[in-house]
Amino acid sequence: GIKVKLAKGFVSTPMVSLGVVNYKANLGIVITASHNPPSYNGYKLKGSFGGPLLPDEIDKVEKRIPDTNTLDIDKINLEDYKKNHLLKYIDLEKDYCKHAMNNFNLDKIKSSKINLAYDPMFGAGINVVKNLLPDTIQIHNEINPGFNGTPPEPIHRNLKELSELIKSRKNIDCGLATDGDADRIGLYNSKGEFIDSHHLILLLIHYLV
């Protein structure tokens, strides 16, 4: 059988990508609607290198998908799978937080006196910032499978509450938001003005390259 390492709970897509590399998996599967409404639920596939599965590999997967929905598939009893040591539960969120702590100077961020606000949009990022930067002001950081009726895409029209929070508090230096599976980011400045991804990439290149 296929050996499976399964996350203990919901996790973000970057956590699965890191897990694929850390555990030397051949494939990573993320069940998610990504930044879309929950009715779009599907799955993302990650290659052994942690990034999106390459096109030729995706073609192989697509060819194995039937043209019509069918329930005529072989089912394996979960307990039997465990007894045969084919299934192991792992804490991908803990692994991800440990990786972040080892690769970023979080103490320097905490001591910088920068006030951050974060909106995970009810998505898979609800715990990680809370664990890494506990003083961050957060909204929409509880489980809501329907995302409160708003597609969890971090663009300005979906983030009005974060923008208004920054404008009203007047002491927030930066606002961050992530989508449903926490692999897309939105950014606000201290005035509550949205910075699109194109300008965000330019800022990252300017300071990191």
Predicted regions and their residues:
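Gly/Ser/Thr-enriched, mixed-charge loops and adjacent short helices
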Residues: 41-169
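Short alpha-helical
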Residues: 11, 124, 203
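Broad structural signal for hydrophobic residues in well-ordered alpha-helices, predominantly aliphatic
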Residues: 19-20, 100, 129, 208
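N-terminal small/polar loop signature for handling phosphorylated ligands or for N-terminal nucleophile
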Residues: 1-41, 132, 136-188
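Small/polar loops that bind or transfer phosphate-bearing groups
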Residues: 8, 120, 197
